[in-house]
């Protein structure tokens, strides 16, 4: 039986490519996106495939997935400083409440979870690209 993976932010740039990769590797993929910044055009080629299902859902609301679940890849989040200014509350909620909901789902399903971050945590970096040990150049008071 194929492993099942939930990919949040599935209609975004990274999420859609992850859906493609996991399907190509024989996984049963459950894509989830609220489509605030994601676009169905990124995953429409997957509709109708036996090993793909899409849930139009906001992870800041309770998340229920029936059956077994092996992995959760949490990539849901507005991904641009422009979006952060336009929808600041939603951005904060998906990173906090959305992560909380998905951690609860991972616990319920005994699934492994990967939570994506963003280069924005480095602030305005002094070096490019940033290595894993780069401390960042973040102004803690804004």
Model-derived segments and spans:
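N-terminal Rossmann-like NAD(P)+-binding domain of SDR-like oxidoreductases, especially those catalyzing
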Residues: 1-142
């Amino acid at each position: 039986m194929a492993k099942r993976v939930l990919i949040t932010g599935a209609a975004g740039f990274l999420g859609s490519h992850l859906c493609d990769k996991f399907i190509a590797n024989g996984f049963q993929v459950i894509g989830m996106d609220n489509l605030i910044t994601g676009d169905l055009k990124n995953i429409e080629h997957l509709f109708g495939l036996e090993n793909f299902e899409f849930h139009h859902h906001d992870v800041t609301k309770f998340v229920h997935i029936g059956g077994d679940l092996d992995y959760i890849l949490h990539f849901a989040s507005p991904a641009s400083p422009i979006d952060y200014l336009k929808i600041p509350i939603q951005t904060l909620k998906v990173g906090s409440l959305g992560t909380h909901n998905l951690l609860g789902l991972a616990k319920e399903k005994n699934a492994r979870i990967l939570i994506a971050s963003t280069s924005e945590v480095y602030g305005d970096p002094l070096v490019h690209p940033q290595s894993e040990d780069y401390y960042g150049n973040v102004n803690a008071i804004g």
